Amino acid sequence: MTNKAAKIAKQWLDDADAILVTASNGLSISEGLNLFANDKKLKEVLGDLVDKYHLPNLLTALVFKYPNQLDYWRMVARVVEYYGNNYEISNYMQDIKKIIGNKSYFVWTSNIDHHFALVGLTNLFEIEGNWFEGVCSNHPAEHSVHYLASKLHEIYEKDQAGTLTEADIPKCDECGAPLALNMAGEDFQINQKQVQAFQDFIQKYEDKKLVVLELGIGPRNQMIKAPSM
């Protein structure tokens, strides 16, 4: 970006009535979370599961059809412990918060890491869900969504101690069926409160000075980039 372009961008941000932050996996990669990478960090996060199931990256690990629920939840707990429960705000997130300042804002993201919420940016629409939430595998639409942060930490600790059993598998409070992560797929339950809040935000600022701050979104992105053009 040239100095002239940077000055114009700063002026737009200063003059904005509100800021819409749109973000995809490029931002996550900048923070050190790369769903597509086959590197040393993959084994650091997933441990023995990498060789056991020949997992080439985190994305494959998340969608792999495990032969048992214990290994599925071992995988989930290890990923969420590393990238979620142990998350420390990055320089990128600090900069985003600084740019937003006291202005009205909303975040529209396809990232599943929940990092925006973890740093306090809770005016948020997670269009593909996040890996802290679970839904009933038998009645995903009818039964409530479960927030699993503490449960996943418990699973992680038992996994590390070698004491994890079938009794520790997260289950639906309403029917006792196993849970599944509430992320993109046929059972995904989009957060309707987030949808409504996002619609309200857009309607409120559609005729005002609304700046779109696009972060890490590829040119072919159809979920966020295309509809926001």
Feature names for model-found ranges:
Residues 1-229:
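Conserved catalytic alpha/beta core of Sir2/sirtuin-type deacylases, generalized to analogous enzyme cores
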